[in-house]
Amino acid sequence: MTTDFCPGYPAPYDGLVADYPDVSVYPADGFRVEWGPIFHRGRLDGSASVLVLGQDPAVLETVARRILVGTAGQRTQGLLTKLGLTRSYTMVNTYLYSVWGQGAADRHVNDPLIAAYRERWLTALIAHNDIRAVLTLGTLAATAFTAWRATADGAAFTGQHAALIHPTYPESASASGQITKAEATKRLLENWNAAIPAVSAAIPSPDQPPTGVPYGDDFTAADLTPIPAGDLPAGLPAWMRGARSWGVRTGADPDTKRATITVTVPPDARPWM
């Protein structure tokens, strides 16, 4: 059996992953630095036409060592499928590390050293790919991208920018009581539907024809796309690419929960049963 996999980090990205900011830049009271940095997902071979800028890695990303593989990743992958993209994309996050605690994400988005490293990635990706569109997921990503656009390198970018509502906005907004989950999902999908025509027009040669099927008022199974094996490190099992959540932080107190991730193989992926 032949299985595709992410080949790793060629130049110039090898220099970026070798020289990443540590706890002296990302404070431990705001980020889960103990789990290490998580850099990207997608193509680093110069073939990307779309750049996705996310927020920060969550539980599943921490295990898989690539960004946007959980719920947000499945929804984002589905959006790329609607755009006709199966390979020609690349993704980075606003933050290298998972955010810890209330307010840390907003407090640190403009920290000079955090921003400087993030902007090195954005500059390298856009310099070494024919990026026609940038999709920012949520307000933090839009803020980070706008800040990069104000730099000399960013000012030279002439592609499309689609500022999208974050893929897990329905869960976060409804949990805080701002809005019902159904209403929040409808708002999200209206935002995504509105962005699709301009982004599609900016991509002259998608990997396959765009689906032409807009979102409805809620996500359906057809709107979610499994993470491609070629986006993940060699050897990760196929069930880590699917829509089911297989990892969760566990513990009786905040410190234990921060230090512990429990991974469970889904029942239908247990060959001994």
Which role fits each region the language model picked out?
Residues 1-273:
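A polyanion-binding, active-site-adjacent surface
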